[in-house]
């Protein structure tokens, strides 16, 4: 058995541009202009990006009832802003139509490349989180960090923004293909981090790129994507490794904004993916501590945004590592019955930037669901302890009823736990298992 990081044991004892019908091959881009109808479906073709249609897998009467064409490319106006350690504050704008914009920039194929993609009604109002994430990444390593700004296409109505995500994904794929053609970029060195609709954009980009390295879906948007075919939503085939963080997984009918569906190679559900600790407090305090705009963001979607917080703090966290564990369900996890990484380490993984260490254990045909607990304030990480209590059964013994307490001492401190909040029956010869967590680092 491997000892998992961060947990301790205590024992008391791409879309096609060609339509094939019969034996006839029709090039949609040549034969159909924008917004024309083809067999009852509307189609829009965009130079270099291909054709986008309504209907088919993109329509569902319940899950995707309004299906429209994307806006024009000029309206969505995708911008690629490059940051490096050489220029951490001043962006270089990269353009897929301008080779010199790349050649004259600090972009290097000798560095891994990180894309950051925002979601709905984001960036122009709520951009600071992306630049903060960029700063953390550059502190961590020597990366090319590209912030993708598609704020021209992410406004109301929501269904129009969802349609525009397909174009944004195609734009990212086009830039990567240009970088591959112009300077020899290896797509396997590219990692797209997308939040909300940005997660779905990452999937659209990945399906067009041969061997995209990694996608991190940060609470991928539920409305218009949950329960839809893989052509419509993110799925494990979109990159060589897809990891997902779920923090707002209630149904949209209960005001949840993120997917509950498992859509990656590994899907993390911190705090069961719902009701994140600290959010009720954050919704009010954020107006004071973070300003009006970020306060609005937290008030409307604290659970949804919490996935960004978790990823952000995972980048340079060393003292405490957020580890998720495979478990039957959340209740079983809370009972302390899932603390085994397995002999090969395949039953646990680090949530966040270092999740790629799970890649050797991935199964392209199966999503692995993992649970962990977090605190309600930064850096959010908790140390998890599995406590196993086994009672002997001497010849003269009787069962007892009461509370069980634990005092845990380490080189750097001591923490007291109440293992049984309610009166509990204790039977001689029985074994009891608990999960306790703390944000205190008590071991050297």
Predicted region positions:
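Flexible, membrane-associating and regulatory peripheral segments of lipid-active enzymes
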Residues: 2-147, 154-164, 174-187, 233-236, ...
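Glycine-rich nucleophile elbow surrounding the catalytic serine of serine-hydrolase chemistry
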Residues: 118, 192-204
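Short, well-ordered amphipathic alpha-helical segments that serve as non-catalytic structural scaffolds
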Residues: 171-176, 242
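Alpha/beta-hydrolase fold nucleophile elbow
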Residues: 184-196, 215
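Mature extracellular/periplasmic domains of secretome proteins
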Residues: 205-209, 230-237
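Active-site nucleophile loop of the alpha/beta-hydrolase fold
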Residues: 214-225, 244-250, 273
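Short, solvent-exposed loop/turn segments at the edges of secondary structure
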Residues: 237-240, 261-263
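Catalytic His-Asp charge-relay segment
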Residues: 240-244, 267
């Amino acid at each position: 058995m491997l000892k998992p990081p961060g947990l301790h044991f205590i024992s008391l004892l791409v879309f096609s541009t060609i339509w094939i019908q019969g034996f006839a091959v029709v090039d949609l881009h040549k034969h159909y202009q924008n917004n024309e109808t083809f067999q009852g479906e509307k189609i829009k073709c965009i130079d270099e990006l291909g054709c986008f249609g309504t209907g088919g897998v993109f329509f569902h009467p319940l899950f995707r009832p309004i299906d429209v064409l994307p806006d024009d490319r000029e309206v969505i106006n995708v911008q690629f802003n490059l940051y490096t350690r050489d220029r951490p504050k001043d962006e270089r704008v990269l353009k897929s139509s301008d080779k010199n914009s790349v050649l004259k920039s600090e972009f290097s194929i000798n560095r891994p490349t990180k894309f950051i993609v925002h979601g709905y009604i984001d960036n122009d109002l709520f951009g600071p989180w992306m630049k903060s994430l960029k700063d953390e990444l550059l502190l961590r390593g020597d990366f090319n960090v590209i912030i993708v700004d598609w704020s021209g296409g992410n406004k109301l109505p929501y269904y129009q923004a969802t349609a525009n995500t397909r174009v944004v994904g195609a734009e990212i794929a086009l830039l990567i293909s240009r970088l591959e053609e112009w300077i020899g970029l290896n797509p396997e060195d590219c990692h797209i981090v997308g939040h909300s609709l940005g997660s779905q954009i990452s999937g659209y980009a990945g399906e067009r790129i041969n061997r995209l390295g990694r996608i991190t879906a940060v609470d991928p948007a539920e409305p218009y994507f949950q329960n839809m075919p893989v052509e419509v939503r993110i799925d494990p085939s979109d990159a060589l490794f897809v990891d997902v963080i779920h923090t707002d997984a209630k149904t949209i009918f209960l005001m949840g904004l993120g997917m509950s569906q498992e859509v990656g190679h590994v899907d993390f559900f911190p705090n069961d993916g719902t009701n994140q600790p600290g959010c009720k407090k954050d919704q009010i305090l954020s107006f004071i501590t973070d300003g009006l705009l970020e306060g609005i963001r937290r008030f409307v979607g604290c659970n949804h945004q919490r996935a960004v917080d978790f990823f952000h703090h995972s980048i340079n966290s060393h003292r405490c590592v957020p580890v998720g564990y495979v478990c039957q369900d959340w209740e079983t996890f809370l009972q302390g019955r899932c603390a085994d990484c397995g002999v090969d380490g395949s039953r646990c993984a680090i949530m966040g930037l270092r999740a790629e260490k799970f890649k050797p254990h991935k199964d392209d045909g199966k999503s692995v669901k993992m649970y962990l607990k977090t605190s309600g304030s930064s850096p959010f990480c908790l140390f998890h302890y599995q406590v196993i209590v086994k009672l002997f059964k001497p010849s003269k013994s009787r069962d007892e009823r009461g509370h069980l307490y634990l005092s845990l001492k380490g080189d750097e401190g001591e923490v007291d736990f109440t293992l049984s909040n309610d009166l509990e029956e204790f039977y001689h010869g029985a074994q009891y298992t608990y999960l306790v967590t703390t944000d205190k680092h008590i071991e050297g």
